[in-house]
Amino acid sequence: MSTWTGKRVAVLYGGRSSEREVSLRTGAACADALRQKGHEVVLLDVDLEVAARLRAERVEVAFVALHGRFGEDGSIQGLLESMAIPYTGSGVLASAMGMDKTVSKAIFRSLGLAVADYRVFPRASAGSIGVGDLPFGLPCVVKPAGEGSSVGVHLVNEAAELGPACRDAASHAGDVIVERYVKGTEVDVAVLDGKALGAIEIVPANAFYDYAAKYTAGTTKYFYPARLPEAHVRAVMQAAEAAHRGIGCSGVTRVDFIVAGDGTPYILEVNTLPGMTATSLVPKIAAGLGLSFPDLCERILDGAALKA
């Protein structure tokens, strides 16, 4: 029996971020899965009245199914802490650090994890960034520091592409990060309660795994387990666990890597609230271990707690 059997569960989804549509899918899928396990579930689309609605609905525990700003960055976690409502996923500080790529990259380096060379530029100077500002040259990857789901991310191969890419990244959240492009195999690792569940290989139809590749059906192939030498899989899973611990995460995370030809796992980011539809990557990995989607959601719910 679940820790929260008989309790009123709110699945928090939607919200105001650029990843709202993804969150709506995640929340609906998780709510359905928890109902299949017998839980009393109310779906709450997070808005400026969410605190009043949590009280009105007599919520006893929150399943956080938000993505992006205001949901994955510690904001909703802080509200839940102040209301003494236990919640799933990482706490305020871990969520904030995981969302800010500038902070998380510095932490990864301090842990001894492989991080591609990068530079951080203030949003105000994005329009003046040139190839001469990049000691690693081209190709490079441009991304906003405070977004997820590859929103505002660009692969830049030519000098003429750099300015527009930087200006677009600056239109999103956070500073602009420009990092050396690492050629290799894209691999994501699911971590649950500090233990790596497995590694899945991602093969997009084009050279770059961008927003369209993630969310347009049929544009990307996935291979689980990842088609890598066993030693490389072990290395990437160990790195994922180290990143999860280093950020101070709780519950489930998805840690993204590029595994170079020599087996070096270059870490990209930790997703403290990964996509959780029945066809998302974390559920795919869990299914490979015999853990159904409803069982996975209940495992995550069982870890709900106050973290402050």
UniProtKB/Swiss-Prot annotation:
One of its GO terms (biological process) is cell wall organization. GO terms for cellular component: cytoplasm. Its EC number is 6.3.2.4. ATP binds at residues 133-188. Its main location: cytoplasm. InterPro entries: ATP-grasp, ATP_grasp_subdomain_1, D-Ala_lig_Van_CS, D_ala_D_ala, Dala_Dala_lig_C, Dala_Dala_lig_N, PreATP-grasp_dom_sf. It comes from the Bacteria. This is D-alanine--D-alanine ligase. The gene is ddl.
